[in-house]
Regions:
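Active-site beta-strand-loop-beta-strand hairpin of nuclease catalytic cores
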Residues: 159-162
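Metal-dependent nuclease catalytic cores that hydrolyze phosphodiester bonds in DNA/RNA
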Residues: 1-157
Length: 162
């Protein structure tokens, strides 16, 4: 089994310590997003080296579908994180109240009531489907793993494992 992993920044990590840190979103998407490769970074590399470099230095545009998907994912697989969300009782993200809340709590954690309720309906529908809920209930979620592929450090998180 892997005992240590050397990352792209040259730092060597104890494997178990790295896995523990990977449970923290700020570490996983922040530091490790630049210090290790992932399937997402490989997609950017396949586009061009410039696209990869831009993904490291520039904020990425979040599509409506990705934003909705992240919220549904959180509600189903990480319900303990629901408490970090700010739900603003407006219909549009162009509303002043939404913009004010997003400036304080971050746009990634701020949703309109309309967005939130739509995601809650989808999550409820999934939970109401016995076949789907059986796959989710009691499973381990957001399970981190790291390792070397062809001598390069990679990171990943399994959404769900039974």
């Amino acid at each position: 089994m892997l005992k240590e992993l050397k990352l792209l920044d040259g730092k060597t990590w104890d494997y178990n310590e790295l896995l523990d840190e990977m449970l923290k979103d700020d570490f996983y998407y922040g530091y490790l997003g630049k210090a290790a490769l992932s399937s997402s970074s490989l997609k950017k590399l396949l586009q061009s080296p410039k696209a990869y470099q831009s993904s490291l230095t520039e904020s990425q545009t979040e599509t409506k579908a990705l934003r909705e998907g992240k919220l549904i994912h959180l509600l189903l697989l990480e319900p303990h994180k629901e408490e970090i969300l700010t739900v603003v009782p407006v219909k549009s993200r162009t509303a002043k109240a939404y913009k004010d809340a997003a400036a304080i709590d971050g746009p990634e954690n701020t949703f309109t009531e309309t967005e939130y309720m739509a995601a809650k309906r989808v999550a409820k529908a999934v939970k109401s489907c016995p076949e789907a809920w059986e796959m989710i209930y009691g499973a381990a979620t957001e399970v981190p793993v790291a390792g070397n592929i062809m001598g390069l450090p990679f990171r990943a998180k399994a959404d769900i494992l039974h």
